[in-house]
Swiss-Prot record:
Primary localisation category: cytoplasm
Localization per record: Cytoplasm; Nucleus
Alphabetical keyword list: Cytoplasm, Exonuclease, Hydrolase, Nuclease, Nucleus, rRNA processing
EC number of this enzyme: 3.1.-.-
CDD domains linked: REX1_like
Residue span(s) of domain Exonuclease: 239-385
Family: Belongs to the REXO1/REXO3 family.
Protein name: RNA exonuclease 3
InterPro entries: Exonuclease_RNaseT/DNA_pol3, REX1-like_exo, REXO1/3/4-like, RNaseH-like_sf, RNaseH_sf
Name of the coding gene: REX3
GO cellular component terms given for this protein: cytoplasm; nucleus
Species the sequence originates in: Candida glabrata (strain ATCC 2001 / BCRC 20586 / JCM 3761 / NBRC 0622 / NRRL Y-65 / CBS 138)
């Protein structure tokens, strides 16, 4: 038994969980006990236990199946002395079997092999459209009337855009609700309240002085700036990971930071704070890391787009990588269709896994522990694709 509480022994949140948090928490401790019995290295024990339980939770569709798989795993940890090549979860090998000392998926070591593989993974336009991407080959009507009334994306109150700077009480939950399959309740991770709670916190655990909104349709997005396209920008094929931080203004949802990372060298090619077009309401500093003093002398939207839309950066042949990249391209007001979106590629059924969870599950890397770092997020999405496709994460000389 582990002598004292280990802060890292917490289950990773999932959109749908086979059992409740407490049950998953107890299982992690049982796995730790089993690993200790076979003298598993203590320095790696906590991380390994959490990753094993996460795989159990993802592979088990019901609470009964979860408990069955837990029993098998605990037995096998002791039986095989935690040999990862012999352990199975839901009858699937923990580590893929190898042939002649190499895994079934041969590692990709040349630039040409990388391009070939990534081209095969490009998401088709219909899938992009279904996932909220604004596409250039769809006829939109920017002159279509845009409503003067919008719904607050935080509290759900309908309000007039003209009143956006009026002081109000906007109560909301900063975290998205998660469904707990064992209790059949929707829980807000930010405060632990459920949607069926009678507590006053049910309406929200955070308060702001202004309502805020996001433009969703092409017409609404064009009220800030018209869309640009990469179609006319010729250049060599390249692969770029991209991430934007966004803030709320009087004109909606705007880009306040843009980071671009090169796939092959992992170097940050561009990282700029951006002065939004509308008057700032909330820069989402808690998540974006951008503060009001940062934007005083920052570049404006037009200058930034002029910087990045060029032959040697974002061009018509670029493969862009990100997580939920439709949000980034929408705030950039950019048409582009050569996309690798980890939120789509590695979703669980109709539920999209968070970048934070994917990063921990696939890379054993913890991100977004405090203020979001757009370079960290861009690199995480890029490395997930590398790890899933036999491309070295550490190789920088191609």
């Amino acid at each position: 038994m582990m002598g004292k509480e280990t802060p890292s022994l917490r289950p990773v949140e999932l959109p749908i969980q086979p059992v409740g948090f407490q049950d998953r928490y107890k299982v992690i401790h049982k796995i730790c006990e089993a690993l200790e019995k076979v003298a598993y290295p203590r320095v790696k024990l906590a991380k390994f236990a959490v990753s094993l339980e996460l795989k159990l939770a993802k592979e088990s569709k019901t609470s009964q199946l979860y408990r069955f798989n837990v029993g098998i795993l605990l037995r096998d940890i002791v039986k095989f002395k935690a040999n990862v090549y012999k352990l199975k979860i839901a009858n699937k090998p923990l580590v893929p079997q190898k042939v002649n000392g190499r895994s079934h998926t041969a590692p990709i070591t040349t630039k040409q092999e990388v391009f070939t593989r990534l081209r095969e993974l490009l998401i088709d336009k219909e899938t992009l459209r279904k996932n909220g991407y604004i596409l250039p080959d769809v006829k939109y009507e920017p002159q279509q009337p845009v409503s003067s009334h919008v719904t607050c994306v935080r509290c759900g109150t309908k309000f007039s855009k003209e009143d956006i700077m009026n002081s109000v009480v906007c109560k909301f939950h900063p975290s998205k609700k998660l469904y707990d399959k064992s209790t059949k309740l929707e829980i807000y991770p930010c405060c632990g309240e459920s949607t069926s709670s009678v507590s006053f916190l049910r309406l929200g655990c955070s308060t702001q002085k202004h309502h805020v909104y996001k433009g969703e349709t092409y017409s609404e997005l064009c009220t800030i700036a018209n869309f640009l396209t990469t179609d006319l920008i010729d250049g060599k094929e390249n692969v770029l990971a991209l991430d934007c931080e966004m803030g709320f203004t009087t004109m909606g949802y705007e880009m306040v930071r843009l980071t671009i990372v090169d796939f092959f060298t992992s170097k940050t090619l561009y990282d700029e704070i951006i002065r939004p077009i509308g008057e700032v309401i909330d820069l989402n500093t808690q998540f974006s890391g951008v503060r009001e003093e940062d934007i005083l002398y920052a570049k404006d939207y037009e200058d930034v787009m002029e910087d990045v839309l060029r032959a040697d950066m974002i061009n018509r042949n670029s493969i862009l990588i990100g997580h939920g990249l439709e949000n980034d391209l929408n705030v950039m007001r950019l048409f582009h269709t050569r996309i690798l979106d980890t939120a789509i590629m590695y979703s669980v059924g109709r539920f999209k896994n968070s970048l934070k969870n994917l990063s921990f599950e696939i890379l054993s890397r913890k991100i977004q522990l405090g203020e979001h770092d757009s370079s960290q997020d861009a690199i995480a999405a890029m490395d997930i694709i590398k790890a899933k496709n036999g491309i070295s994460i550490t190789q920088t000389d191609w």
